[in-house]
């Protein structure tokens, strides 16, 4: 969702985990985690909105962001990045039956809403919004930009 280079994520896993074996790690990272193989390993991207994270974990307790909002000052960065991912990859995801509902929901957004999501996602990537505000996504993760 953040738009980092999947190959750099793969290289990072190999570098930091002593027990990482490339023949296992590569398909898991590029295929399942990053969906960089276009759906060979996984049938849909492993992405989630802030609402899903809130429902499934305690990580949102005390957070100032609202997982129900996709844009605006109070929008959860995960919600923003989720919708931005769908916007950026709408054409490719439209061919995936498991993503049909999400793609239809993207199509329902007004142009102004789409623009607001894209602008906020860009601000998140620049490090202007989020838990590491002031640190770009590249600096925070160590991974370069990708589509």
What residue spans do the PLM features occupy?
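C-terminal catalytic domain of photolyase/cryptochrome flavoproteins
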Residues: 1-147
């Amino acid at each position: 969702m953040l738009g980092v280079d999947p190959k750099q994520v793969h290289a990072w896993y190999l570098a930091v985990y002593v027990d990482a074996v490339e023949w296992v790690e590569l398909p898991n990272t590029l295929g399942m985690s990053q969906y960089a193989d276009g759906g060979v390993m996984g049938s849909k991207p492993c992405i989630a909105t802030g609402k899903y994270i809130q429902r499934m974990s305690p990580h949102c307790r005390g957070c100032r962001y609202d997982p129900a909002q996709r844009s605006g000052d109070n929008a959860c960065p995960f919600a923003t990045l989720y919708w931005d991912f769908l916007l950026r990859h709408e054409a490719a995801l439209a061919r995936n039956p498991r993503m049909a509902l999400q793609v239809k929901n993207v199509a329902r957004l007004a142009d102004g809403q789409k623009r607001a999501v894209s602008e906020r996602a860009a601000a998140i990537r620049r490090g202007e919004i989020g838990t590491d505000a002031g640190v770009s996504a590249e600096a925070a993760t160590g991974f370069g930009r990708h589509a």
